[in-house]
Amino acid sequence: MGNESGEWIMHGINWDNPDCIHSVDEAIKYINGFGFLPLFKNDIDGFSLEERTVPEYWWSDNPEIDPWMWRAIIAKRHDIVYGKFFDKKAGFISKKWLPVFANYRRDGYDFDALYDDGKAPNKHKKIMVNFMEDNADSEIYSNELKKQAGFGKDGEKGFDGAITNLMMQTYLCNCDFKKRVNKRGIEYGWDVAVYSSIEHIYGYDYVTSCYKDNPQDSWKQIVDYMHEMYPEATDKQIRKLLK
């Protein structure tokens, strides 16, 4: 998706194109087959869900054909993780590739160890305590998490940026999108992002299964794979999107 002369333009393909993804199940199959995929167009040509779908069907509110709705369906199924994983922008990582990304992005650190070594700010800790120890399996609405972590008018600033950074480090993901519920138990408003730890999706042992490897070796594995699948992509483009 690009802004051209003040107008947002979607880049995609026709329904009859053999490379077109037509349904959420086809999207899941493609993501699992490749391993990871940004949601929107980026500097690497063709490397996005946007460029493999019909532009006119985005935001059509039809779950059969709307890729914007697919992202929520995929997040809810907990087979593939969804979040801001690519240059602080949205995308998907398969279960197969998640440990590789986690080892590199976390530099082999669990969050508590990262914080204890002075490599994470206190505002990140205020968020992560809601997903650690007794809270390890929490799924929390974004508005509730913001309040619980002490962000807001008279508290910490930069909640959205902190969440994005924790996703980029693969500590958090969007595990669902749901409407809020009022005191009478009635849903209202727009769908709201729901966050969880990635360990909640795949389990701690699996997520950390590449910690035994050097994080730079995990990065090399990602880069080598991208060069194999997208030989026209430059090191600079790969580094910008995936580092």
Model segments located where?
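Long, low-complexity intrinsically disordered regions
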Residues: M1-K243
